[in-house]
């Protein structure tokens, strides 16, 4: 015989099971969340340097001495969680001509305007937040090489490449390989290699005494 008590007992059992299932789900969610947070805590920023599309070659002066300088865009992507910052401590361009390696280091950040590159501030360390891209136009200039780093036959001003010698090189070359480097806090680096396309239009612009600058397209290597 059926009475009201059996129905109530069945409903109570169902309610208890549902409550237990909800508790288990909540526990699993909290465990997964805790695990995610724990993994995130130990995760290091994952940064990538995207290769530039072009590099501008231009003349610059130290007193009366004319030398080669460059401007390009460095785009640094941080593929990490938002709270994971990467600290950029330096940027440089490296190139080798006639067997001599030269280095240009970041000088200023800026933007392109009607009159060309307009500096907006000195280059200094900056952070890149997770999930973002830091995109900046950067001018690169030579620096004196430390005496402790000099190779046989080198001088402290080895990184200043004479403009006329560059034009001589360019007259017989069709490309120039450039090694792009981002220096990170902790000693790690990001790199990207490109090959500048020195076609006739670029050469003509660089040789024009009224201009002396040109944007060379980059081929990713």
Predicted region positions:
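Membrane-aqueous junction of the first/signal-anchor transmembrane helix
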Residues: 1-221
């Amino acid at each position: 015989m059926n009475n009201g008590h059996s129905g109530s007992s069945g409903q109570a059992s169902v309610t208890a099971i549902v409550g237990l299932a909800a508790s288990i789900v909540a526990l699993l969610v909290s465990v997964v969340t805790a695990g995610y947070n724990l993994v995130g805590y130990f995760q290091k920023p994952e940064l990538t340097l995207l290769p530039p599309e072009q590099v501008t070659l231009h003349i610059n002066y130290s007193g009366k001495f004319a030398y080669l300088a460059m401007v390009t865009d460095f785009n640094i992507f941080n593929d990490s969680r938002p709270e994971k910052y990467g600290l950029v401590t330096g940027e440089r361009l490296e190139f080798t001509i006639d067997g001599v390696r030269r280095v240009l280091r970041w000088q200023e950040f800026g933007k392109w305007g009607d009159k060309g590159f307009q500096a907006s501030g000195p280059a200094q360390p900056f952070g890149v937040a997770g999930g973002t891209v830091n995109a900046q136009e950067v001018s690169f200039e030579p620096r004196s090489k430390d005496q402790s780093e000099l190779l046989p036959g080198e001088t402290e001003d080895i990184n200043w490449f004479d403009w006329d010698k560059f034009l001589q090189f360019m007259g017989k070359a069709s490309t120039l390989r450039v090694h792009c480097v981002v220096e990170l806090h902790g000693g790690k680096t990001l790199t990207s290699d490109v090959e500048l396309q020195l076609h006739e239009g670029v050469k003509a612009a660089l040789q024009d005494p009224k201009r002396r600058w040109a944007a060379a397209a980059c081929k990713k290597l």
